[in-house]
Structures are given as structure tokens and as C-alpha cells.
Amino acid sequence: MSEVANEASRRRTFAIISHPDAGKTTLTEKLLLFGGAIQMAGSVKGRKAARHATSDWMALEKERGISVTSSVMQFPYEGKIVNLLDTPGHADFGEDTYRVLTAVDSALMVIDVAKGVEERTIKLMEVCRLRDTPIMTFINKLDREGKDPIELLDEVETVLGIQCAPVTWPIGMGQRLKGVVHLLTGEVHLYEPGRNFTRQDSTIFPSIDAPGLAEKIGAQMLAELRDELDLVQGASHPFDLDAYRAGKQTPVFFGSGVNNFGVQPLLDFFVEHAPPPQARTTTGRVIAPEENKLTGFVFKIQANMDPQHRDRVAFMRICSGRFSAGMKTFHVRTGKDMKLANALTFMASDREIAAEAWPGDVIGIHNHGTISIGDTFTEGEAVTFTGIPNFAPELFRRARLRDPLKLKQLQKGLAQLSEEGATQFFRPLTSNDLILGAVGVLQFDVAAYRLKDEYGVEATFEQVSVSTARWVHCSNEKKLEEFREKNALNLALDAAGHLVYLAPTRVNLQLAQERSPDVRFSATREAAHTVSVG
């Protein structure tokens, strides 16, 4: 086996998806704790607590207690290298989350035991479906009262349309929680609450027949457990590796992230069964991870990870070959060579210069406005990875400046925020308005906060009569020019210089489409096909 193939086979790159408040950031912390990446997990709950959660590093996130930006963390575990991409927990952050899911090989779905499958989980699951992403499920907050576990499995199967294969099973819940049984090994892990900031190895009995277990959990509970296990093993699906890797079955674990309980069986199972990096499609061919030449694509751009340095970092997922510090690469969209000098590896906000990286790893490249989301880097081959979209925003606001002299800073700030993909920025052809588009309201708060915090610009966002946006394309130049002349009042350029139709109403959009049958109106745009500005 080549060195590239060997290193690729050790990688496990995944994201955690959940509805807000299901405990995703806490679970992220605990996985890092068990992986030895952090000594002490920061609790997410206390907003004013001295120790903030490791993965929530932007000041706004620290104030609000939600993950606004997706960060990347790497840790070694049991001979494997785990790359965990944290996704925003708040309901608004659809696009960024979608793009993160294009950069992973599997996902972990977190469900609150009391709430079951929630709306955001359904949406994220649809995204995973598009790519048949393998998913494991962690049913969290077992230390609180919640739904019956059998009912929960039924709900996941019915609502999300995926077969469940329980791997651990709870012994009680809430006040009566005593532990979990590992259905594949037969081991019983006892619940010992309280030591939630340090790594906790629970007491393990080899089976439910082990002497001393009845004294620990009570004879009646043990009898109930035997009956329940008979029922579960008779009614549920056994774990099937092929079905899981095809995205048709989800192995299910129960636990309490905040109490470090049930996390270790999940992590052990994950590194053993989750897929290593997979082959990926480009415009020219399919690229296998074990190929010797480096390829990778940018799925996210983050500005000002270090406020002292006003920097922008492009996050690149390596798809094949070996990255080494300072190597020369080919930036496919611009057709230019680019030296990747001080590339970074991540442990949330702690950044280290990457000496080398392998398929499945994510590196950060310093970016001065030349790199866009969706860009592909190779060692010379002109291919582009596909499937990294921009979505048409659903909400629009006009930016208003408190100080008109700061227009230049405002334009620069909006262009950079748009380059990250958190919000989109449109400049109408016939006015000087600056219009921002987003998938959710919170993104406008984030934009206003970051403009003030990072660019020194105080801006407000007011309502604007735009209901939806569509990118417009036409292969016939003459017809496109006619369309531009007739519809100039509704046309704008996005931050990458593409023509966009801003419709005041859905009816207006429908009429425009009917009147111009030769023009294609798209709700998404492949991020790779951008023309960078600034």
C-alpha cells in the first residue's frame, strides 16, 4: 500500500448535524475530550462562563452561546486521525452547513431524547440524502426524561426514512438512568453523573448476566431490561456495514453528552466503521484518494479568524495525494500557479502551520481575495470538483451607513462577508444601493456585528422590496443584452460579478420567466464558476 493510500485509510472526516440546542457543541467538546485533544471541556451553557466551548470562537458566538461559523478540529484516536467539522447550530445557517457537508465522508446526527426529530434535522438529513452520506445517530440528554427509546427509533425511521440499527440501549432515563448496554459486545456501561469536565471511564460489566450487576442497578430494573432487550433485538435491524455506508441505515447510540456518558462507545464504533476518504467527481473524471498527485477544493472562507491580523483563510479539503508545506499548486479557476506557503491545520481557534496533510484532512490557506468558495487546486490538471453550490437567498435587506464617508469600508466588508458565503451581496445595475441577501434573519445581525467589530463600520439593514433572486444565463449574447435592457431595474451583480434578477414578488419572477423563454433563471449557482473581485 502506498504512503498516500495508507494515510488516507486512517482518516475519518465527518460533521455533526442537529437541530439547535440538541447538544451538538457539547458533544463536539466531549469527542475532543475523549480524543485527548483538550484536557478540559468548556461547558456551552453558561454564557458568561470563563471557559467558552473550544469550537465557538467568534466573539458573537461567545456572547450568544451558539455556533455561528463552522470550524475544523483534528485529533488522533486509536491509530486513526479524526477530522471533525463543526457546523453552525443556529437555524439560519443553511448554506455554510450545506457546504461543510460537501467536504465530509460521513455525519453524526444528534437528537434530543425529549424532542425527537425536529425540523432542522429533517432539512439537514435531506442534504445528506443528496450525497448518500453515511450517518450515525446519537440520542442525547438521556439524563433527562424523554420519549420512549423504541418510539424514538420508530420516529427516526418514519420521519427521516432511514433504517435504525441500535448499537447501545439505555437502562432507564432521567432520574432512573443507570447506564447503557452495548448490543454488539453485550457489555454494560454504568452511568456515573457529575464528572463532566474530565474524561470519565465508566464502570463496565462484561454482560447483563455478570455477578454484581443486580446490586448496582436493582433486580427489578435488570428484569425489565432483559424483557426490553428481547423486544428490541427481535424488532430492530442488526447493524449492516454496507447498508450504513450506502446511507440506508443509521447505527444508533444513547447517552448524555454533558455528562460524558455514552460518548466513548460511539467514538470507538465510529473510528472502526465510518468510511475513510472516498473517490470524488470532477468535471473531467472521478479522482480516487490514493492517487499520488494533490487535489483539493475550497468549501469555506472565513475572514478575521485572528482579529489582530485581519486575515482571511480559505478552508480546503484534500481529496487526493499529499500536501507538503510550500508546495506549488495549480489554481484551476484562474489558470495560475499558486504557492501554498503557510497553510494551517486547526484545533478550533488554535492554528498550527501544516508540515503535511493527506486525503480527508482540511488545511487553511491564507487568502487575499484571490480564492473563492468552490475553487479547485491540483498539481497541474485542469479539473474542477462539482457539487458545491451557492443558493438563492430568501431574505433581503438594504445596507444603510451611519457615516457616509465609510462607504469604501462598507463595500469591502460586505464583499468579504459574501466571499465567505455567510451572506450574499448584490449591487443593482441602476442604483447605488448595496443589498444583502441571506438564508435567515440572524445572518443580518452577524453581518452588522462583524462590520462594526472587524471593519469599524456602523451599518443598519432596512427592508427592501426584493422577494427572491435568480441567477440568469443565456447562451445567446444578443438575447441576453435585450433582456438586460428591458429588465435593468431588476438586475444586479453579485459579489463575483454574475448577473442576478432581483424579483419584487414571486408573480413578477414568473412573468419575467414567461417573457424571456431563452433566459435560464437558476436558484443555485455552482460556487466553482465564480469570477473573483477585489
From Swiss-Prot:
It is found in: Cytoplasm. GO terms for biological process: regulation of translational termination. The keyword Nucleotide-binding applies. PROSITE patterns: G_TR_1, G_TR_2. GO terms for cellular component: cytosol. GO terms for molecular function: GTP binding; GTPase activity; guanosine tetraphosphate binding; translation release factor activity, codon nonspecific; translation release factor activity, codon specific. GTP binds at residues 18-25, 86-90, 140-143. Its main location: cytoplasm. InterPro entries: EF-G-like_DII, EFG_III/V, G_TR_CS, P-loop_NTPase, PrfC, RF3_C, RF3_dom_3_sf, RF3_GTP-bd. Residues 9-278 form the tr-type G domain. This is Peptide chain release factor 3. It comes from Stenotrophomonas maltophilia (strain R551-3). The gene is prfC.
